[in-house]
Amino acid sequence: MSNRRSRQSSSAPRISDNQMIDLVSKLRQILPEIGQRRRSDKASASKVLQETCNYIRNLNREVDNLSERLSQLLESVDEDSPEAAVIRSLLM
C-alpha cells in the first residue's frame, strides 16, 4: 500500500513553496471577502483556501439557482420565440 501511495505522489507535479505563496497571494486578490481587508490583516494560507472553497460553493449554488430560474422562464415563453432561443443558449 505504501508503494501505491509513493507512486501516486511521485507522478503528481510538485508545487514549490514559492508557487504556493504566489497562488495564495493571487487568491487573496480575487476573493471579495479577503480583498476588502486591510493590508495589515492578512489571512493565513489555510484561511484563504477555506474561503476559496466556500466562495466556489456559493458560486455553484448561484449557478444552480439561476439555471432553475431560467428553466422556469423558458417554460413560460413560446418555445419558438427569440426569447426562448436566448434562454436556451444561456442554459447550455
UniProtKB/Swiss-Prot annotation:
GO terms for biological process: brassinosteroid mediated signaling pathway; gibberellic acid mediated signaling pathway; photomorphogenesis; regulation of growth; regulation of timing of transition from vegetative to reproductive phase; response to brassinosteroid; unidimensional cell growth. Expressed in roots, leaves, stems and flowers. The keyword Nucleus applies. Induction: By gibberellin and epibrassinolide. It comes from the Eukaryota. It is found in: Nucleus. SUPFAM superfamilies: HLH, helix-loop-helix DNA-binding domain (SSF47459). Residues 4-59 form the bHLH domain. GO terms for molecular function: DNA-binding transcription factor activity; protein dimerization activity. Atypical and probable non DNA-binding bHLH transcription factor that integrates multiple signaling pathways to regulate cell elongation and plant development. Binds IBH1, forming a pair of antagonistic bHLH transcription factors that function downstream of BZR1 to mediate brassinosteroid regulation of cell elongation. Regulates light responses by binding and inhibiting the activity of the bHLH transcription factor HFR1, a critical regulator of light signaling and shade avoidance. May have a regulatory role in various aspects of gibberellin-dependent growth and development. PANTHER family: TRANSCRIPTION FACTOR PRE, TRANSCRIPTION FACTOR PRE1. Interacts with IBH1 and HFR1. Gain-of-function mutants (T-DNA tagging) show long hypocotyls, pale green and slightly narrow leaves, elongated petioles and early flowering. They are not sensitive to the gibberellin inhibitor paclobutrazol during seed germination. This is Transcription factor PRE1. It comes from Arabidopsis thaliana. The gene is PRE1.
